[in-house]
Design a protein with these regions (language model features):
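Glycine-rich loop-to-alpha-helix module at the N-terminal edge of alpha/beta enzyme cores
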Residues: 31-119
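ALDH superfamily catalytic-core signature
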Residues: 231-367, 430, 476-479
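Conserved C-terminal structural/oligomerization subdomain of aldehyde/semialdehyde dehydrogenase
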Residues: 27-33, 197, 256, 310, ...
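Hydrophobic face of amphipathic alpha-helices that form TPR/SEL1-like repeat modules
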Residues: 1-25, 463
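Short, well-ordered beta-strand elements within core beta-sheets of diverse protein domains
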Residues: 30-37, 52-58, 147-148, 255-258, ...
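Residue-level signal for inorganic ion chemistry
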Residues: 28, 64, 86, 108, ...
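Proline-centered turn/helix-capping motifs that create local helix->coil transitions or kinks
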Residues: 109-124, 307-311, 347-352
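Rossmann-like NAD(P) dinucleotide-binding subdomain of oxidoreductase/dehydrogenase enzymes
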Residues: 123-265, 387
Length: 479
């Protein structure tokens, strides 16, 4: 067996005394063992992040730009290695894994460009009597050491969405990766080490939850950026004290399909949005509301599209639905489906488990209080519900503790803007599924879906602080 995978602190790889297994979620076989940090390791990582922050804030933007471009290039050069690792570690279908690597390359490339254009502002202060000679200049400065806690489902790009803007803004960052997928984050550490940044600019430290909570409460971190479940995110926020917090949490994304929509297109997009990567994304399509006049037609087309999606071995390029991340996830989803059926829901397709893979499952006759409707499924299950009036669909979609993204398929611009005004979400996507995300757009939600925004430019704003300079400009003598 290969040596246990070390973690990265202060530009050096360290072995820990405690090892944890990382298993292939499709085969269940051991993939690798990873060293996890002790309290002493955590203290070293925190201090390394603090020390690096002092150096990082002095780096000129051109140096940050070139370092981020090197990271993007390193990712691209090793793209096949990263993709294979994500397929083995996260069970991510090969085509999705390749797509994620390309997105991560773009995330670092975008961050490199944004490093050159962190904005400032000249503010006239002569609006009130007595301030005639005053001028203000506002610039954004690095916030300081950042703590990033990342999920399993995008083990590269969601790490990139914390690391890239942190470095672009002139900060250092400590990443605590998901216990199911630490290998991808550690491989990214190899690439970052070659970019010429100060030691400790990026530290990567797998650890247990108890130690992670100690990191969260440590006042030396000035910002926590967390992506994960709502329950954990809000619990951590309560422990953060004075530090700034960005939370990207869960969702149970809804879609509205109107009679004037391109029904074939909507069905095709909803199938991909609901079942890609086995529905293990926070913006996976979970609830579809279809106008009653087209409900039968849409459902027929949707079921045909879903039935074409191949489930199974994620290393097969034709696979769309791979394994769930672990047996607990599989059992939970089976339980929720069974509970919904016992409460009156009907299974239109799927509903069975094949080892670690759940069949694509479509349910009808669901109610808003069923777990499959009101909680985050995070699995390959989609509900289809008819409605009579557009306002009824808006109300139903809002009947959720979450508010991340929503899709509306219609050609009526008035209805699009009505949805934009009234849907309680972070983004409304017209004639597109809520699963869509561009890596430079502001991304985040409301209600239990989080606070703050990701997307490189938005994240840089969170990872910097405004600083004001006031000039009292008196006229030179003799003028």
């Amino acid at each position: 067996m290969q040596e246990p995978r070390p973690f990265l602190i202060g530009g050096q790889w360290r072995q820990g005394e405690t090892l944890v297994p990382v298993n292939n979620p499709f085969t269940g076989k051991l993939l690798a063992e990873v060293s996890t940090a002790s309290s002493a390791d955590a203290e070293a990582a925190i201090q390394s992040t603090v020390d690096a922050a002092v150096v990082m804030k002095t780096l000129p933007s051109h140096a940050r730009y070139h370092a981020l471009q090197k990271i993007a290039g390193g990712l691209y050069d090793r793209r096949d290695e990263f993709a294979r690792l994500m397929t083995a570690e996260a069970g991510k279908p090969a085509t999705d894994a390749k797509r994620e690597v390309n997105r991560a390359v773009q995330t670092f490339t975008i961050a490199a460009e944004e490093a050159k254009r962190i904005p400032g502002e000249v503010i006239p202060l002569d609006w009130t009597p007595g301030t005639d000679s005053h001028l203000g200049i506002l610039r954004r400065v690095p916030i300081g050491p950042v703590l990033g806690i990342t999920p399993f489902n995008f083990p590269l790009n969601l790490v990139a969405h914390k690391v890239a803007p942190a470095l672009a803004a002139g900060n250092s960052i400590l990443i605590k990766p998901a216990p199911q997928t630490p290998l991808t984050a550690l491989l990214l550490g190899e690439v970052v080490l070659e970019a010429g940044l100060p030691p400790g600019a990026l530290n990567i430290m797998p650890c247990d939850n108890k130690l992670a909570e100690q990191l969260v409460v440590d006042p030396r971190f000035k910002l926590l950026s967390f992506t994960g479940s709502a329950a954990v995110g809000w619990m951590l926020k309560a422990k953060c004290g004075k530090k700034k917090v960005v939370l990207e949490l869960g969702g149970n994304a809804g879609v509205i399909v109107e009679p004037d929509a391109d029904i074939e297109f909507a069905a095709q997009r909803c199938a991909i949005g609901g079942f890609g990567y086995a529905g293990q994304t926070c913006i996976s399509v979970q609830r579809i509301y279809v106008h009653h006049s087209i409900a039968d037609l849409f459902t027929t087309k949707f079921l045909l599209q879903v039935a074409r999606l191949k489930a199974g071995d994620p290393s097969d390029d034709s696979t769309v639905i791979g394994p769930l991340i672990d047996p607990d996830a599989t059992h939970r989803i089976e339980s929720w489906i069974g509970e919904a059926v016992s409460q009156g829901a009907r299974v239109l397709l799927g509903g069975k488990r094949m080892g670690s893979v759940m069949e694509a499952t479509v349910l009808s006759h669901v109610t808003p209080t069923m777990k499959v409707s009101c909680q985050e499924m995070f699995g390959p299950v989609v509900t289809v519900t008819p409605y009579r009036h557009f306002g009824e669909a808006i109300t139903a979609l809002n009947q959720s503790d979450y508010g991340l993204q929503a899709g509306v398929f219609t050609q009526d611009v008035n209805k699009i803007f009505h949805a934009f005004r009234h849907l309680e979400v972070g983004a409304v996507l017209a004639n597109e599924i809520p699963t869509f995300r561009a890596d430079h757009m502001p991304y985040g939600g409301v209600k239990d879906s989080g606070v703050g925004r990701e997307g490189v430019q938005a994240a840089i704003e969170d990872m910097t602080e405004p600083r004001m300079l006031v000039l009292n400009l008196k006229p030179p003598a003799g003028t």
